[in-house]
């Protein structure tokens, strides 16, 4: 995807970067998959990025097909690319039980668990990039996970 900034300079998202984190639970550790895209041209340091967006999927889908689907001929099909091209550091993750993240615990993957996953993800993103506050965008039950997370962690 490519866009043109107000200065006529071409902006585009970098290829995605895969990240893995481990979240401890009462039943043992779980591995969670995170996906990151940022703008090319070095605009990803804490001093130059416009913000950090964390996209949260719903209950019947995984993160990348929802937020980073690239459709040939449709430049704005990936919300991650759209925001990255405008200077945001963008992240998404597969909550436990979805996509590439662990699915081995015999539990109901509910809103509370999703909010716990978001806390682990934002801890990791803060350690990795220095971001301290997040713009959280959730769809379907992802919006509920984001709301519970925001209620628990208003400082983020």
Map each language-model feature to its residues:
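N-terminal cap/lid segment of alpha/beta-hydrolase-fold proteins
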Residues: 3-48
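Short, solvent-exposed loop/turn and secondary-structure capping segments
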Residues: 34, 46, 65-68, 101-104, ...
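Short, surface-exposed "cap/lid" segments of acyl-processing enzymes
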Residues: 41-88
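Catalytic nucleophile loop
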Residues: 57, 92-94, 135-139
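Glycine-rich "HGGG/HGxG" loop immediately N-terminal to the catalytic nucleophile
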Residues: 62-65, 91-109
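Glycine-rich, phosphate-binding/catalytic loops in enzymes
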Residues: 70-74, 108-109, 153-154
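Conserved acidic catalytic loop of the alpha/beta-hydrolase fold
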Residues: 115-133
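Conserved hydrolase catalytic core segment
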Residues: 132-137, 141-156
